[in-house]
Amino acid sequence: MIEASKLKAGMTFETADGKLIRVLEASHHKPGKGNTIMRMKLRDVRTGSTFDTSYRPEEKFEQAIIETVPAQYLYQMDDTAYFMNTETYDQYEIPVVNVEDELKYILENSDVKIQFYGSEVIGVTVPTTVELVVTETQPSIKGATVTGSGKPATLETGLVVNVPDFIEVGQKLIINTAEGTYVSRA
């Protein structure tokens, strides 16, 4: 059992009614009067629906045991993403709604980890950083410095990140997948 106050983004737990829930965001909130509450943005792993809720810090949940196996992202067709276990070559279908955030960071044939809850495939984990190519951005400004405010750049997966002014179309960038931010040029 794990207390609500110990839940952090990325953790998965099971509710009393059997729902498998992943924490997307968690924060402590202390109102002017009353006790501390935990505000959370959660996703039902099986349905993909997201919702906001609050818990008392002492509420307890059953932490889900999640296993991961190495895999490769194959392709997306309609509302399904296809992955292959790189050890057994088994293929898995995952609804896009369950992995839409992760798909922003991976290209076909990218290495990922498939998450299992028992024998049920519930999602994927992407590397902490990925290399992606800039497909669209404003032209560089002559004399731009690193300390500038930056500009938006669209990457090959469709992800838009804020980058320094000196970045140009065609450059390969390292992106932090936890925060969706520019790290450096590759």
Swiss-Prot record:
Q: Which keywords has UniProt assigned to this entry? A: Cytoplasm, Elongation factor, Protein biosynthesis
Q: Which PROSITE patterns match?
A: EFP
State the Gene Ontology terms under molecular function. translation elongation factor activity
Q: Which GO terms describe its cellular component?
A: cytoplasm
Per the record's keyword annotation, is Zinc included, yes or no? no
Cell compartment(s), UniProt: Cytoplasm
Quick check: keyword Translocase in the entry? Answer: no
Its GO biological process terms? peptide biosynthetic process
- Which pathway does it take part in? Protein biosynthesis; polypeptide chain elongation
Any single Pfam family the record assigns to this protein: EFP_N
This protein's source sits in the domain of life called: Bacteria
**Family named by the database record:** Belongs to the elongation factor P family.
Q: What does this protein do?
A: Involved in peptide bond synthesis. Stimulates efficient translation and peptide-bond synthesis on native or reconstituted 70S ribosomes in vitro. Probably functions indirectly by altering the affinity of the ribosome for aminoacyl-tRNA, thus increasing their reactivity as acceptors for peptidyl transferase.
Q: What is this protein called?
A: Elongation factor P
Q: Which gene encodes it?
A: efp
